[in-house]
């Protein structure tokens, strides 16, 4: 009797969405690291921007729902040193604001609304890197673009969110240099 109760509890635990998501992310990670992989991995550029604004949490969530393997997001640093998702140097194209990301504080950026692919305003706001990583955690790999030059800031957030193993980061230096640094 005790054994059957244990098995039922174990099954209930294993069927929880968080557990299954973590299993999925780890499987994707193994695929990424497999040099002999014989299948194609699907990457959503700036999330699923056809459904939600690019580089938004909603675009990441949509990519996860579509069972995409990797989501590519772009990072910029604000005037007060916070990391936000934004492809362009400026906020003009993707929000209802104007100016450069580096000239705005996080509070100013959080007041803005993101535009959809057709330029219409949405209810979505510009997410921080931390918000994006927490949305992706355990469910999908994340390819961080425009992040290498702010590596220390990015890595601190990866450590804080426990997502370092789920991130791919591009850089302009040879692997040997990166390992030394």
Give the ranges of each region predicted by the language model.
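Phosphate-group recognition and catalysis centered on beta-loop-alpha active-site segments
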Residues: 22-181
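Bacterial Sec-dependent N-terminal signal peptides
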Residues: 1-25
